[in-house]
Amino acid sequence: MSSVEFSNQPVVIDNGSGVIKAGFAGQDPPSHIFQSLVGNPKYKKVMGLNIENESTYFVGDRINDWRGILKLKHPMDHGIVSNWSDMERVWTYTYDQLKIQPSEHPVLLTDVPNNPRLHRERAAQLFFETYNAPALYFSIPAVLSLYASGRTTGIVLDSGDGVTHVVPVFEGFALPHAISRIDIAGRDITEYLQHLLRRSGYNFKTSAEKEVVRIIKEKTCYVAHDPQKEEELLEPDSSSSKPVQPQYTLPDGNVIELGAERFRAPEILFHPDIIGDESLGIHQCLDMSIRKSDLDLRKTFYSNIILGGGSTLFQGFGDRLLNEVKKLAPKDIKIKITAPPERKYSAWMGGSILASLSTFKDLWVTRQEYEEDGCSVIHRKIF
């Protein structure tokens, strides 16, 4: 079908498992960033507000005002939508925040690789039939992160809240046979930190308290260069000077002291077996994806490793990854890891760049195409 023109700026939505990033193509950074959470009241009546209808829900900034009386749920689990009603509520809130008519703006939506085809078809159905979007395009976050770094070839390690991917990209196209996926990411680190804190006597039970643990994770956790050495420093009989144990003040004013939990929690990215998962570590997946790529591309990929996603932001993450990959890679191979400072939003930024290009108009799936060919049309235009 011939290319189409749209008078209104495309909307870019990075549909993360933990955080939604949304705004208009050409913007930098995204204009709206909020937790991908839906809160339902745990009680029927709270102060002067009568909440008796189960359809009552809270999304985005409204959650902060009522957090203590809400049961919080993520619509997505490991990159896959698990509750479509809640996902629709999050997208409706997104449009409300953007203050636009959905029928007037094409949408670029991120979707992680190797997700079920039915997942993408259901999303397309919602955008075309519920929101009446004029056009839609799905793109892989890792590819967009690469664009944001100014490259079209490289290998991206993208670790967000729900899932971690290693995606080799050549000239803007992901190499599907070499993609690696690990269902361990930020939310798993939060849950393991919650477990470790419980063992230390700090009990965080509710879904709202779990959000407090997530914030503790983001503010205090780090990746140890040598976990064994860190453990030895914390041993009671260690002769070495012990590191200062940082403290964290909880919303209720209580103070907790954090020790080995700070590096033990993120360690599951490198050693999933700590939590009983049989997946390979991220460094092993990265090396495996490179080795699955064509022989003449491997050298390029080793020297163009790009980090993306919020779970790569831990202090020490890049140095540790480099050290681990060096142990696995061929000798004398040049290894370079690039960690863009804005990588928490790099997928959105890449989408903003892509949707702004004049040539991108050829890639949209229009509502007319959807109505003529059905859901299958969306699988023809994705990379």
UniProtKB/Swiss-Prot annotation:
Function: Component of a multi-subunit complex, PPK2 (poly P kinase complex 2) involved in microtubule based vesicle motility. It is associated with the centrosome. PPK2 complex can synthesize a poly chain of hundreds of phosphate residues linked by ATP-like bonds.
CDD domains in alphabetical order: ASKHA_NBD_Arp1
Classification via PANTHER family: ACTIN (PTHR11937)
GO cellular component annotations of the record: centrosome; cytoplasm; dynactin complex
InterPro entries per UniProt: Actin, Actin_CS, ATPase_NBD
Protein known as: Centractin
Subcellular location: Cytoplasm, Cytoskeleton; Cytoplasm, Cytoskeleton, Microtubule organizing center, Centrosome
Source organism phylogeny: Eukaryota, Amoebozoa, Evosea, Eumycetozoa, Dictyostelia
Record bears the keyword Cytoplasm: yes
Homology family: Belongs to the actin family. ARP1 subfamily.
UniProt xrefs under Gene3D superfamilies: 3.30.420.40, Actin, Chain A, domain 4
Keywords from the named record: ATP-binding, Cytoplasm, Cytoskeleton, Nucleotide-binding
Ranges for region Disordered: 227-246
UniProt superkingdom: Eukaryota
Pfam families hit by this protein: Actin (PF00022)
BP terms from Gene Ontology: vesicle-mediated transport
